[in-house]
Amino acid sequence: MKIFLLGGTKDSINIIEYIKNNYSAHILTTTTTEYGAKLAKEGGSDETLARPLPKDEIIEIIKNQDFDILIDATHPFAAHITQTSASIADELKMPYIRFERPTTNLENIDTSRIHYVKSFDEAGKLIEREFNQGNVLHFAGANTMEDIIKYVPCEKFYPRILKVPSSLEKCEKLGISEDHLIAMTGAASLEENIELIEKYDACVMITKESGEIGGVIEKIEAANQKDIAIIMIQRPQIKELNKNSIVSNLNELDIKLNSFFKKR
């Protein structure tokens, strides 16, 4: 059985490892970075493609290589990719699974310092209006910096990025100096987040509601301990998705996969 996996997340690595341990399957994983492809290969993916793929090219690959199922395990905020993948599966009449990581359980967490917004533009305006006196930690990826920089001076802006050429080029283009860049991979621990808040004398942190696997709880707890604000961008809602195609953990994924092909 051949699986076309849209990856680039920790979820996708977990999926690769689970499938290779439990099923007889060939997996092609697509990511937007060489780093993501490297992790997918290490996780057991048989093939990787490390570049953004337009819809027509994905369709061509799936048709030419006879893939049996399309799994979308991209980031919750990669809404356009999920919309595209669902459209492709519908067009090709092929099995489709969307792995949607659970939202963060904040039941026992102090959320009084969280300001929820629906977009990065809204986040930038909020900072300009209410948090313009201190420094800003941007823990929401290189692709979203431009919306914030419109409202925040570069000298007050400290983004956490992957140290890859595309991210470094974006920073240079936006005028963000190298000594403001926080190069890290993986979710930061509570201690690491506290250290970054202290080091850069931040008054506010920007993050996405990317789930526990994205380190959201550690960010909130660090902000609480250091008494700074958090601006949380809410997840986009994708209306095109059929709820029956969504799974949120490996057990649910297993049930779906079992309906398509047998375990080893």
Language-model features and meaning:
Residues I59, Q65-A123:
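Glycine/small-residue-rich loop that forms an oxyanion/phosphate-binding "nest" at active or ligand-binding sites
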Residues D68-I69, N135, C203-V204:
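Structural motif
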Residues E172-E195, Y200, V204, E209-K226, ...:
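A C-terminal functional module that forms or caps the active site or interfaces directly
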Residues F139-L181:
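Anionic-ligand binding region
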Residues T31-A37, E100-L106, A142-T144, K163-S166, ...:
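Short, polar loop motifs at secondary-structure junctions
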Residues F4-G43:
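N-terminal glycine-rich anion-binding loop in soluble enzyme alpha/beta folds
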Residues L28-P52, E107-I109, K170-L174:
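N-terminal beta-loop-helix "entrance" segment that forms/cooperates
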Residues G43-I62, I182-E192:
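Glycine-rich, highly charged phosphate/nucleotide-binding loops
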